[in-house]
């Protein structure tokens, strides 16, 4: 049976675009909150194959999305590199900062992927239960974005600690990037082996970089990951998500050779249509706040996205993750409108 999501990545335009949502397994769902409460900590949920598989499948059962994305986190790679990673309630991730060349010199060059066996087992469990027409997405964080957390030891408003280190100590910073590139290649290949149909590389903080730094620290490492995966799996379908890239999107697509690019809601539609969608599939890009608002505002926002990208290959998604406060009825409203569309 065909998988519409994979068909788009393979070059086939669909009249009604396939649809899924970033963070579709999340706190807006009561069934997720129930499992999350049983799991204990966030990483406990990520590393419990039974629970991680369950929350991955929940939005598929409820909404029938065209793709499931494995429930995990971009910071499992630092964990596999031997770094301390913990999630504190109300504060987000905490790591031991790698903010000097001396500390960076202690970083392992390759991840111990046995620490991520639970992720691969969760993928196998989801694969066994997914409908035949539903794709399964594996993922990793892009090296730049993961490095911002590793350098600062936490999320920061403007990623200044990583940006400063990259300017002041580029050789030391490159060591972090190199370790993340090699580890991400191995991690993504193991996800494909475990049953993933496609992969997404999340570069959440790409948009804070200058054009020169974007080319060096976002696009180039992503290209290396794509090349490394395809050297072993030439048929691998890979989506890049350089959030906030804006006018740099065409260059990113050309440099990385991804099969599709996910875009946020600030992307200029004419630029994307003419210089991006003419070459690869486009995924996105509903504003999560429009989804949270609902009503006529949501209908208009959905229609705008559909009309903007109807002429080419398109996967309907949000421009970033769904917000926890979003009513389920608004997701149903969005899906009804997308599925009725005949572009």
Curated annotation (Swiss-Prot):
GO terms for biological process: protoporphyrinogen IX biosynthetic process from glutamate. It comes from Bradyrhizobium sp. (strain BTAi1 / ATCC BAA-1182). The record marks 73 as: Transition state stabilizer. This is Uroporphyrinogen decarboxylase. Pathway: Porphyrin-containing compound metabolism; protoporphyrin-IX biosynthesis; coproporphyrinogen-III from 5-aminolevulinate: step 4/4. It is an enzyme of class 4 (lyase). Its EC number is 4.1.1.37. GO terms for molecular function: uroporphyrinogen decarboxylase activity. Keywords: Cytoplasm, Decarboxylase, Lyase, Porphyrin biosynthesis. Belongs to the uroporphyrinogen decarboxylase family. It holds the Pfam family URO-D. It catalyses: uroporphyrinogen III + 4 H(+) = coproporphyrinogen III + 4 CO2. Catalyzes the decarboxylation of four acetate groups of uroporphyrinogen-III to yield coproporphyrinogen-III. It is found in: Cytoplasm. It comes from the Bacteria.
